[in-house]
Amino acid sequence: MGKTRRDLLVTGSRVAAGLAAANALAPTGPFGAAQALADPKSKLRRPGFGLAFKSLKDETFLPSIDLDGKLPQWLTGSLLRNGPALFEIGEEKFNHWFDGLAMLHAFSFKGGKVSYRNRFLRSSQYWAWQREGRIKFSELATDPAPDPCRQIFSGVSTLPVLGRIPNANVSIEKLAGEFRAHTEIPIPVRFNPKFLNTMGIGDAGEMQGRLGTAHPHFDPETRERFSYEVELVPPSGLRIVSEKGRTRRELAFIPQAMPGYLHSFGLTRRFVVIVSQPFNFNLSKFLSPDRGPIITNYEWQGEEPTRIILVDRQRGGVAHTVETDSFFAFHHINAYEHEGKVVVDVCAHKDAGVIDALYLKKIRSGSKVPQARYRRFEIRLEGQGKMSQRDLIDAYIELPQKNYGRVNGRHYRYAYGVGLRKGSSGFIDQLVKADVKKGESKLWREWGVYPGEPVFVPRPGGKAEDDGVILSVILDGRRRKSALLVLDARNMEEIARASVPHHIPFGFHGLYAS
């Protein structure tokens, strides 16, 4: 693979080196890469970026896609991805990136070749598109056109009698051999990983909460699955639950008059870690006649603290609560216990403004999206429970991944994510490998290419934490199509890429299934 295919950087103070490397990527055209990246008025600074939020309506199966490079022989499974792919239905438009119709993607590896398949999740919203040609159900930031029959809680109702299949466009979970798509409504949608056909919703026992997490945790040692549910109506609050087989246990219920928005949580050997942030649900506003979509009923109350709550996994109940200045986080990176402290690493935003920045009108216009810092909190378990915090690396990071099976809930060194180059405007333009031991990062960046979540796949038998590959679905704006990028996870150098003949809209999360 020639050096003109990648821009490999090691962060620190090497801005000049980064620009020099970008110059080596100069495309054909009136501007070199470095100039286009640096000049905010340059039309070339984000070529093809509009495709990231352009609908993809076609479902397809490609038994073999173009491959540049050579795949590791041990890579024989499938990368499964989830994300929005349809942003309008007829004349009606979804408002937010989080609202688009869910599409599943599968890149499968066999005999050194790569096949590709995509398929819409057959949600109730999907069938409304097919049968009625309209947006029928509420999403996070989009309500359907006025309908006198619409129930006030239609956007968040999880009652199984409704037969509602949610638009589960966020993440994928493998549990007991079953593959499930998730969103923040706690009804998983089962699907076949080979053909991507929708197989129905999960058990009714999982539907007690109004909202839930798209990122449950599974502990392979205890065989427990952990999640939470948020009750928006009285008695409102946060319920922490664990499941083992068919046994479900409520670890804690934390009353909250105005429940805060949650997307993920952390897990250590002893604790469930909740970051309760002051982006609070206003029930009275939600019940008013002029209420808007569900997310518009949340209010950022930055004068309130963000609370880190530790729930005891074995005994149940809240073991510790500490407070810090307000911040907002979608994603936990990791959490673990070390030398009498609980270490909590998150992608920390200044406030909840990132949600507003991800409305489609704003993001398509090229508005800069607020970026998250790699922030560590250390909570002492003895005495007054004092807490310290610091940012671990200089680079921004979001959509974090790690060697999950090896280090989740345990002491670790490496994490991976997406980010935006310092000083640039826009959304995402690089992949990040964080070394929290050294406080350094390695970056992969290529001009005009926009990467997605990096999924780490460990090499069978590998001893080092970072011995494996990174799989990231990238949008090549210059060629106006997407590809699967394969990097060596140790040095972030490209091994191969497999291209599809069309664009794939920006997605959220996925996993590798062997």
Question: What does each model-found stretch correspond to?
Answer:
Residues 193-207, 243-256, 307-325, 377-396, ...:
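Blade-edge beta-strand/turn elements of extracellular beta-propeller
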Residues 238-245, 289-314, 359-381, 429-436, ...:
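Beta-propeller blade signature
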